Amino acid sequence: MTYLSDDEQYGNFEIPVPEITEDVYSNALISAYIQRTYDDDTPERWSQLPQVFINSDSSTSAYLSFGEGFIRISFQSNESVGNLFDRFSGRVLKLIIVN
């Protein structure tokens, strides 16, 4: 994780993406999908960011932002973002740039 707040309710990580040039930053649409895999017979699939997880105890979300040369995946929670970060670790991220 690139950044984690002291209360662990916010964190993010950045990935260099040299394809996001000044022109892309100013004019393009960028979307991200996270691969969802399962240990049973459930078929794999892709889910688009942002992702929101709500239950009776807590709510967490993950979302995409970008700047010239990088993307940032941010996590927010009313408790700790640790579990959500663990869920995303090791998953394939698909980035779509439409310019």
Region roles according to the model:
Residues 1-99:
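First exposed extracellular module after export/assembly in secreted or surface-exposed proteins
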